[in-house]
Swiss-Prot record:
Pfam families: CbiA, GATase_3. Keywords: Cobalamin biosynthesis, Glutamine amidotransferase. It comes from Rippkaea orientalis (strain PCC 8801 / RF-1). Transmembrane segments: none annotated. This is Cobyric acid synthase. The active site is at C331, H436.
Length: 495
């Protein structure tokens, strides 16, 4: 099996982007190619058809390669959950929660075995594996326990690309410093350098590139210009780079930027809608009166629920609802909508019960049992009979409170044909569900947006549209076209 490795001088250099592009380019050339990331730390996750959990970026890369995502493409997934701890997922299954120090003491050998086992499985099925590193391969305090970068490249004898983000400045120093900190046998694997996110006149780089090639004896394979192509970010730091409302188009939807926000790739399909403006709102910000507010998934529901209360955002949400606003909670956000979140085993906090937002007559019980599965269901709202697919990733069950006394009776109906997946209130202003990937469903997404548009007196949009995967396919081709145009990949490609 031919191996290609993509490492970066820093986080957010463009490793995922270029790995994805290479997968699509090779797939278009007829190669049977697979992505691979030995260990990924991310809160954006995807559920494979077998019920295993992997990083969402590896699922996107699998789609770029025109194959079905599998747990072998990301054998280790670490999901940060606060207090300097992470949930450890090996081959798709949660195996424990640990601190960084405990992880390397308890899971390093097991992790490397999982990585090599997955590589063996992929080697038996694919012609080419395109591996993605993590962070930097030259973190000298971490190299001895780095499971993701040059250890994998050396194991596979992979032709390796070093990517640098020039937009943040210091690109030449980053490249030289990274190469100087690699061992000679590691540096020998680097077959080329890619300069990413360049803005400006290309010729201004010529003298710098000539110097860099002479100094390092490694060719610069290309310079990728900055392009506004929709590509999912791996962690919430990417949300800081997003603009707020970018124009004055029809609908304004605010997504709360929870401290432990997860699976915010759920909202890429909304971002692709030209009539929608998304705003990721800090909890200390002013909510105002957008057309809808979304409370997204959370890796640590209780901590983020507490943050809603302590920042005053919970009160802003109450005022917003009283004024007729629309709220949608997904997964952890759904759990927060109820009256109480119970944590009997204190899995997330020091108490056994926490006050919810009290917007729906529901209660959630956090459990150690983790539900991870794909779903195919039918909708009841905003219209009945719409086919919906997605996936669940959550710990806990949410149920109606049997005896709920309030000044005004709140009537609920189930959102889908499976009552366990979500509810909507009678006025259709409070929506909650466990389903990730909900907005990938084109007809459901447009129907929900049309409901918001009708509230504003705006004309409806066509609902007979394809699911988001067709838009995603176009984006993947655009990414591949960009890299293919500006990067010479022949030195690392299979012959």
């Amino acid at each position: 099996m031919k191996a290609i490795m993509v490492v970066g001088t820093t986080s957010h250099a463009g490793k995922s982007f270029i790995t994805t592009a290479i997968c699509r380019i090779l797939a278009r050339q007829g190669w049977h190619v697979t992505p691979f990331k030995g260990q990924n730390m991310a809160l954006n996750a995807y559920v494979t058809p077998t019920g295993g959990e992997i990083g969402h970026a590896q699922a996107v890369q699998a789609w770029a390669a025109k194959i079905t995502p599998s747990v072998d493409m990301n054998p280790i997934l670490l999901k940060p959950q606060g207090n300097m701890t992470s949930q450890v997922i090996i081959h798709g299954q949660a195996v424990g929660t640990t601190s960084a120090q405990e992880y390397y003491e308890q899971y390093f050998d097991r992790g490397w075995k999982a990585i090599t086992s997955s590589l063996d499985c992929l080697a038996s099925e694919y012609d080419v594996v395109v591996c993605e590193g993590a962070g930097s391969p030259a973190e000298i305090n971490l190299k001895h326990r780095d499971l993701t970068n040059m250890r994998v490249a050396h194991h596979l004898n992979a032709a390796t690309i070093l990517v640098v983000d020039i937009d943040r400045g210091g690109a030449f120093a980053h490249v030289v410093g990274t190469l100087q900190l690699l061992e000679p046998e590691e540096k020998a694997l680097i077959k080329g350098i890619v300069i990413n996110k360049f803005r400006g006149q290309r010729s201004l780089l010529d003298s710098g590139i000539e110097w860099l090639e002479n100094y390092t004896s490694i060719p610069v394979l290309g310079v990728i210009p900055w392009r506004e192509i929709m590509f999912p970010s791996e962690d919430s730091l990417g949300l800081l780079d997003r603009p707020s409302y970018r124009s004055t188009t029809s609908l304004k939807i605010s997504i709360l930027r929870l401290p432990h926000i997860s699976n915010f790739t759920d909202f890429d399909p909304l971002d692709a809608e030209t009539t929608v403006n998304l705003n990721y709102l800090d909890l200390r910000g002013t909510l105002g009166y957008p057309d809808a507010v979304i409370i997204p998934g959370s890796k640590t529901t209780i901590a983020d629920l507490i943050a809603l209360h302590t920042t005053g955002m919970a009160q802003q949400l109450q005022d917003y609802v009283s004024a007729g606003g629309v709220i949608l909670g997904i997964c952890g956000g759904f759990q927060m909508l109820g009256q109480t979140v119970f944590d009997p085993d204190q899995l997330e906090g020091g108490q056994k019960a926490y006050k919810g937002l009290n917007l729906l007559p529901l209660e959630t019980i956090i459990t150690s049992n983790k539900i991870v599965r794909q779903r195919q269901i039918m909708s009841n709202y905003p219209y009945s009979g719409l086919p919906v697919t997605g996936y669940e990733i959550h710990q806990g069950i949410t149920q109606l409170i049997q005896s709920y006394e309030t000044e005004q009776t709140i009537l609920l109906d189930q959102l889908f044909d499976d009552i366990s997946l979500g509810f909507v209130n009678e006025s259709q202003t409070i929506w909650g569900c466990y389903l990730h990937g909900l907005f990938d469903n084109g007809a459901w997404r447009r129907s929900w947006l049309n409901y918001l548009r009708q509230r504003r007196g705006l004309p409806s949009l066509p609902t007979g549209i394809a699911n988001y995967r067709e838009q995603r396919e176009a984006n993947l081709d655009a990414i591949a076209d960009l890299v293919e145009e500006f990067v010479n990949l022949k030195p690392v490609f299979p012959k």
